[in-house]
């Protein structure tokens, strides 16, 4: 299924419970579609959300509102039913807002082009944490929900771990050779996987973030802009060459290609109900959002993975297994950032949510 968005798109997000998908466009517009398996998606809303591009899009409050971020440094909350603005924070960040993710039912995190990460509490209606975690743009973030630690990646080539309970940067990796573009937590919290500009997947062991414990180079030289976790052993990767692949983690292997998004980069991935995946490309002459039903394909891939694992177990070579002892934490690390900033302009941002 392919949808002509009319303009270059930067981000997408599925509704948590309804058949809705939102998209943020280069002209600052926010689009909302209803989709189904037997008909073309229907556009429900078109809102001019920002004066500059709409880089980040997320459903919040159980899907009742959509939060968007922009290079104009603002964050906007829009009502899903009416399309009306609920609240706008004009100076949410000092630099362009590049990424927004959900943390809990009442908190979200936003990252900007200056390396700053902020956590917003919709219940307390304020910014509750601020971390100057990086020196370049925030490319991606994910939450370890059991420990309430926020993992972030950046164009400066480092990975950070922010402790939300203690309000400090707990760990930071050494500089890698190229930009880190995407991140997921795998293996029941024991591994962190990062996609990089060179196409190498960097695997970090939890608690040993100084340097990666393993590298997977089979996707090189095409940068991995998007990572999507399917389960604790498999991820979907979106690469610069437009290829979407199913990849196994420890043992590391490309299980199979899933789809090809023409010859243009895949820069965002999202999934809903473990069977529908939406892929969006971000080039000036690509204005399409594609949706696939991968239910049968993923079931076949699971059987393929089990067969491959059984064969390798019989070989007993263990070449792909991460059995090396993690390196000791050494080297320079940047100091923890200042604690939650009391931004007066943000105190009532979520007042109407």
Residue positions per predicted region:
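Terminal intrinsically disordered, low-complexity extensions flanking WD-repeat/beta-propeller proteins
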Residues: 10, 179, 212-225, 231-233, ...
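Beta-propeller domains
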Residues: 23-42
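Beta-strand-rich domains and repeat architectures in extracellular enzymes and scaffolds
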Residues: 2-28
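Canonical WD40 repeat/beta-propeller blade segments in eukaryotic WD-repeat proteins
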Residues: 6-14, 51-59, 94-103, 136-143, ...
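Short C-terminal beta-strands that terminate individual repeats in beta-propeller domains
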Residues: 1-4, 42-49, 85-92, 111, ...
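Conserved strand-to-loop turn within each blade of WD40 beta-propeller repeats
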Residues: 24-27, 69-72, 110-114, 122, ...
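Structural hallmark of WD40 beta-propellers
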Residues: 18-22, 63-67, 76, 85-87, ...
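WD40-repeat beta-propellers
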Residues: 30-35, 75-79, 117-121, 159-163, ...
């Amino acid at each position: 299924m392919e949808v002509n968005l009319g303009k270059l798109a930067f981000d997408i997000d599925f509704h948590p419970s309804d058949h809705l998908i939102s998209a943020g466009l280069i002209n600052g517009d926010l689009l909302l579609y209803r989709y189904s398996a037997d008909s073309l998606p229907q556009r429900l809303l078109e809102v001019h959300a920002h004066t500059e591009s709409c880089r980040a899009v997320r459903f919040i409050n159980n899907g009742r509102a959509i939060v968007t971020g922009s290079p104009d440094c603002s964050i906007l909350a829009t009502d899903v039913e009416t399309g009306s603005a609920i609240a706008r924070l004009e100076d949410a960040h000092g630099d362009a807002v590049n990424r927004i993710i959900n943390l809990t039912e009442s908190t979200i995190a936003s990252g900007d082009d200056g390396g700053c990460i902020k956590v917003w509490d919709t219940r307390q209606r304020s910014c509750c944490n601020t971390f100057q975690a990086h020196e370049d743009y925030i490319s991606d973030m994910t939450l370890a929900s059991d420990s309430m630690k926020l993992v972030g990646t950046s164009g400066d080539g480092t990975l950070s771990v922010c402790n939300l309970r203690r309000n400090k940067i707990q760990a930071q990796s050494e500089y890698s050779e190229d930009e880190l573009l995407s991140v997921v937590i795998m293996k029941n919290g024991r591994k962190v996987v990062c996609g990089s500009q060179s196409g190498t997947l960097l695997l970090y062991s939890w608690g040993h973030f100084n340097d990666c414990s393993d590298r997977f180079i089979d996707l090189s030289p095409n940068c991995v802009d998007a990572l999507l976790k399917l389960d604790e052993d498999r991820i979907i990767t979106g690469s610069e060459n437009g290829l979407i692949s199913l990849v196994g983690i420890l043992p590391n292997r490309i299980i199979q290609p899933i789809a090809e998004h023409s010859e243009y980069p895949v820069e965002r991935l999202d999934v809903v109900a473990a069977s529908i995946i939406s892929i969006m490309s971000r080039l000036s002459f690509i204005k399409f959002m594609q949706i696939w039903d991968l239910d049968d394909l993923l079931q076949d891939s699971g059987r393929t993975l089990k067969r491959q694992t059984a064969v390798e177990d019989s070989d007993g070579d263990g070449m792909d297994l991460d059995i090396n002892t993690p390196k000791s934490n050494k080297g320079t690390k940047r100091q923890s950032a200042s604690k939650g900033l009391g931004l007066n302009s943000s105190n009532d941002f979520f007042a109407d949510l």
